[in-house]
Amino acid sequence: MDSNTVSSFQVDCFLWHVRKRFADQELGDAPFLDRLRRDQKSLKGRGSTLGLNIETATRAGKQIVEQILEEESDEALKMTIASVPASRYLTDMTLDEISRDWFMLMPKQKVTGSLCIRMDQAIMDKNIILKANFSVIFERLETLILLRAFTEEGAVVGEISPLPSLPGHTNEDVKNAIGVLIGGLKWNDNTVRVSETLQRFAWRSSHENGRPSFPPKQKRKMARTIEPEV
């Protein structure tokens, strides 16, 4: 196993522990708590994949971070912060919408890259809106936290989420996943639109009414249902 992979996991575990202690003091805002929950799932998945114990990794990560801090000067810290572009966290969904339980009568699932797409293909003739929580950098989507499809009644009928065991995805990965989700939902004559926030940062080629316009390859796929569950 690559040593950088192990040390990266160890540092991530310790930094999550620090953030959790911060949240336990009721100091974190909604986006902070949202990321904390998502990162916890990601760390559990990575730990399982790597065969590493999270508690042991957290202790090792603490030693690594302490060593770095001992060697870090205030001036170097200022230069590092100034050189890193700041990302913004955008929320379409409330905490209730993020944590809302849902089940599928006709479950379908597809994995594309490091993203998992799930939907209920029993849903028919509904008006559906896609909402997402994600970070933005340079006016483009940086990291998808969670995307969900809601009916007008507020029911969750679809979802795109990062796979904990496969961290990392691009803006194009997210766009492709959105296309697959919309294609599956439209199969049963549902009307699907994308939130204004998603249109602006993740789906730039959209019509004014919020219904996305697909590239030719994606349009051909629209006539097919989503692939069988994996």
Curated annotation (Swiss-Prot):
Annotated region described as Disordered, given as residue ranges: 205-230
- Briefly state the modifications made to the protein after translation: Upon interferon induction, ISGylated via host HERC5; this results in the impairment of NS1 interaction with RNA targets due to its inability to form homodimers and to interact with host EIF2AK2/PKR.
The domain of life for this entry's organism is: Viruses
Which UniProt key words apply to this protein? Eukaryotic host gene expression shutoff by virus, Host cytoplasm, Host gene expression shutoff by virus, Host mRNA suppression by virus, Host nucleus, Host-virus interaction, Inhibition of host innate immune response by virus, Inhibition of host interferon signaling pathway by virus, Inhibition of host PKR by virus, Inhibition of host pre-mRNA processing by virus, Inhibition of host RIG-I by virus, Inhibition of host RLR pathway by virus, Interferon antiviral system evasion, RNA-binding, Ubl conjugation, Viral immunoevasion
Kindly state one GO CC term assigned in the UniProt record.
host cell cytoplasm
Q: Does the keyword RNA-binding apply?
A: yes
Q: Where is this motif: Nuclear localization signal?
A: 34-38
- Annotated segments matching region PABPN1-binding: 223-230
RNA-binding and homodimerization: annotated span: 1-73
Q: Name one GO molecular function term.
A: protein serine/threonine kinase inhibitor activity
Looking up SUPFAM superfamilies in the UniProt record yields: Ns1 effector domain-like, S15/NS1 RNA-binding domain
Q: Where in the cell is it found?
A: Host nucleus; Host cytoplasm
Please state the span of the N-terminal signal peptide per the UniProt entry.
none
GO annotation (BP), single: symbiont-mediated suppression of host PKR/eIFalpha signaling
Q: Which Pfam families match?
A: Flu_NS1 (PF00600)
Q: What does this protein do?
A: Inhibits post-transcriptional processing of cellular pre-mRNA, by binding and inhibiting two cellular proteins that are required for the 3'-end processing of cellular pre-mRNAs: the 30 kDa cleavage and polyadenylation specificity factor/CPSF4 and the poly(A)-binding protein 2/PABPN1. In turn, unprocessed 3' end pre-mRNAs accumulate in the host nucleus and are no longer exported to the cytoplasm. Cellular protein synthesis is thereby shut off very early after virus infection.
Q: How does it assemble?
A: Homodimer. Interacts with host TRIM25 (via coiled coil); this interaction specifically inhibits TRIM25 multimerization and TRIM25-mediated RIGI CARD ubiquitination. Interacts with human EIF2AK2/PKR, CPSF4, IVNS1ABP and PABPN1.
| Domains: entry comment | The dsRNA-binding region is required for suppression of RNA silencing.
The UniProt family comment states:
Belongs to the influenza A viruses NS1 family.
What's the name of the protein? Non-structural protein 1
* Species whose genome carries this gene: Influenza A virus (strain A/Equine/Tennessee/5/1986 H3N8)
